[in-house]
Amino acid sequence: MSLDPEDYKEPRCPSCTDFYYPDENANVSFIPVDRVVDRLDTLLSHNDMPAARRHLEYWLSEARMGGDKRGELAVLNELMGLYRKMGLKDKAFESAEKADELVKALSLGGSITAATVCLNAATVCEAFDRPREALERYSEAKSIYEDFLPPGDSRLGGLYNNMALACVSLKEY
């Protein structure tokens, strides 16, 4: 039998509930995801891939040090695409794997965010000659996107286009 801190410690005052029900986000330092993505877009518009990589890797470490899991997921999503464009296969797959783990840890399965992770991971698979795996990931994204997005949403068009390319790679017309 083990003792938990609440078995032998007392809260600061009788009405302080944070001792028994701590706020999970109390010590989280959130990264400015919108600013990170805006700066990334600027760097990519100048085709400065090395700077974009440094930028994203810096913010990934900031998110991890600050305990910002959602920020970490956002940066990993961007890194998947950047590593893919740079031809960094191992880094791209590592980012995809970590993003999948975060989707599970944050209980985001079945969400638009989860679908976007699937889509980005699928493009990584497609880029590095794994079209069968890519098609499976695209199918996961498709089932979520079709449930939540309106028919004219551009994300659906992009998904269908990418799925078609995977089908062509597999000679499944």
Question: Where are the predicted features?
Answer:
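Short coil/turn linkers that connect adjacent helices within long alpha-helical scaffolds
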Residues: 26-27, 65-68, 105-109, 147-151
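TPR-adjacent "capping" and linker segments in tetratricopeptide-repeat scaffold/adaptor proteins
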Residues: 19-35, 66
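Intrinsically disordered, low-complexity regulatory regions that flank or link repeat-based scaffolds
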Residues: 1-24
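Amphipathic alpha-helical segments of tetratricopeptide repeats
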Residues: 60-62, 100-105, 142-147
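Conserved alpha-helical positions within TPR/SEL1-like repeat arrays
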Residues: 34-45, 71-85, 112-127, 154-169
